Amino acid sequence: MKKCVVGIFFALVLCLAMLPMAAFAEDTVGAAQSSRTVITTVDELMQFAADVNAGAYDGKTDAVVSLESDLDLSGKTWTSIGCAADNDANVPHFFSGKFYGNGHTISNLDFSDAYGMIEYESYGFFGYIENAEISGLTVQGSVNATGSRKYSDFGSIVGASNKSTIRDCVSDISFTNSDNYLDGSIGLCGFAMDSTFE
């Protein structure tokens, strides 16, 4: 009888000891899920851009964003992901996580309306990234650089990159420049510091 009571006692102690571990595991899974964003529609992409530019992704180096379909942005006014710099070249908000394009294409992206509004601004699908990884993304579209401002960085994938990696991405942009000075206006990235392209 004593052995039976002792056995039950130890079984209860073991069960109680496992409860915090189960709760911790659930919290960990919840945290991992909450930092992942899946994009399947144009509206979801536009919302993601707005969230980054509003500061919702500030400091989220563990953020994972996955593009799950090709998206056509015909008729949409595009604001680069990663806020425009002010005239002192300060960037209020930017993306620092992982963006997986998964081989998908963003098409008919028109950067023309955004270009030239602020001097020293960085333009692209992403405006500015830091400690980020962008992969498997194709951007198709156009830009007509007619603004009066100069010295802007333009890249189809990202305008300016710092301490980041851009991997397996494709730029397919038609470009018209009306007497403005731009860095990197032909390729993936306008300006890069401590960044890797693969």
For the regions a language model picked out, list residue spans one by one:
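Short linear sequence motifs
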Residues: 2-3, 17, 41, 119
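C-terminal segment of classical bacterial N-terminal signal peptides
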Residues: 15-24
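Intrinsically disordered, low-complexity segments enriched in glycine/proline and serine/threonine
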Residues: 5-6, 20, 47
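Surface-exposed repetitive/solenoidal architectures
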Residues: 24-198
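Positively charged n-region of N-terminal signal peptides that target proteins for export
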Residues: 1-12
